[in-house]
Amino acid sequence: IGKATTALKEGNMEQAEKVRIADEEIDQAETDIERLCLRLLLQQQPVARDLRQISAALKMITDMERIGDQASDIAEIIITEDKSEAQDISMKLSEPASKMVRDSVNAYVEKDLDLARKVMENDDVVDELFEEVKTTLINFIAENKGLQGVEAIDLIMVAKYLERIADHATNIAERVEFS
């Protein structure tokens, strides 16, 4: 996520391409982890807490893979668009979404219910921020501030991808209670 948003901020095409390539590695890691979890289920036949942990891990890796997909989608937009001032607007979601991912993973690893709850609370903040960013970008077009329709749509999509990343972080945080 950080590499994708840095690439967007700096207009760094090389960094954006690295993000797209890294998504393939994330996809492979998801497959490998899923295979390990299924092997544990078959060979160990876990019950109770162990079963909940494996189930949570299976769901969590799906969210992590989707976060990688969203970062890759941001990178694809960076590669096709020139850097503009309007990009800063869509980047308002970058830090909150990235922090939510870090915090949700930390909450899962540390079994920190308080941190998980904070992540879940922050989801509403990011949702509101997305609506604000969307409205601002639409106003940029309406006020002829040099933002073309296609670029505005791409930047709204970047903001939406970041909002979806926050949603996936929330899903991970919700699994802390379950596991």
Question: Across the structure, where does each feature detected by a protein language model lie?
Answer:
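Cytosolic, long alpha-helical scaffolding segments
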Residues: 1-179
